[in-house]
């Protein structure tokens, strides 16, 4: 519950250690790594001050000396994930570079399935996220557009990637929980849908199915969605 009258604080503006007293037993990187291990193994809901403290081998209350709020813990985790972005020398083709960024972000989110839940603008200015954004802007250097437009483009690409990965993760989680195989369910649902489309009540859907050449290529859809966003930002 929010405390009225509390003063907002950015975790990155808070000194990791003061000039006095003994050296802290843990760094922010240590704490972030412990939280990431828990989230990777058991999901984001398993991340708590108590569980992170246990992972580090310290008392829960002592952890608050490093991380005042759970929200700060999430921000450390998001920054730790951003540190995994590979930052390359841009090739000079802004479309190719931004597509590479998008594919890498998708891989990163699959590596850390909890990450889409932390994709918030609030966490957008942590140290490693700033390096990532600076890299994206370097990739977009050849694009004749304002920096505001370029940041908008980066946000739109990240939004598409995040939404796509969320759907992939949700589908995979649901499939694991099914009491039957995905193929069995697809066959039953497909038969039902075919009957509905053949009823004549949905002529446009019938036409859409008639022109379909086969199963949807989800990889191609991902690439196409991104390409169409980039098309919108091509200089006219």
Feature map (PLM): residue ranges:
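Amphipathic alpha-helical segments used for helix-helix packing
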Residues: 78, 106-135, 166-176, 203-206
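Amphipathic C-terminal alpha-helical segment
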Residues: 159-174, 193-216, 231-236
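Helix-turn-helix
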Residues: 30, 34, 38-72, 76
């Amino acid at each position: 519950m929010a405390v009225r009258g509390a003063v907002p604080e950015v975790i990155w503006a808070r000194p990791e250690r003061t000039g006095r007293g003994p050296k802290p037993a843990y760094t922010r990187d240590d704490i972030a790594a412990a939280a990431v291990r828990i989230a990777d193994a058991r999901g984001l809901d398993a991340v708590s001050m108590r569980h992170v403290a246990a992972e580090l081998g310290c008392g829960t209350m002592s952890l608050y000396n490093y991380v005042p709020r759970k929200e700060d813990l999430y921000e450390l985790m998001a920054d730790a994930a951003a540190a995994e972005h590979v930052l390359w020398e841009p090739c000079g083709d802004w479309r190719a570079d931004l597509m590479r960024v998008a594919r890498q972000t998708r891989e990163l989110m699959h590596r850390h399935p909890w990450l889409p839940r932390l994709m918030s603008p609030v966490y957008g200015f942590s140290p490693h996220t700033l390096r990532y954004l600076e890299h994206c802007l370097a990739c977009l250097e050849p694009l004749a557009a304002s920096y505001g437009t370029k940041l908008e483009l980066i946000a739109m690409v990240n939004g598409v990637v995040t939404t796509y990965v969320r759907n992939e993760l949700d589908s995979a989680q649901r499939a694991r929980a099914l009491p039957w195989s995905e193929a069995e369910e697809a066959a039953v649902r497909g038969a039902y849908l075919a009957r509905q489309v053949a009823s004549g009540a949905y002529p446009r859907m019938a036409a859409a199915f008639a022109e379909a050449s086969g199963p949807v290529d989800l990889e191609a859809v991902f690439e196409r969605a991104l390409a169409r966003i980039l098309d919108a930002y091509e200089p006219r």
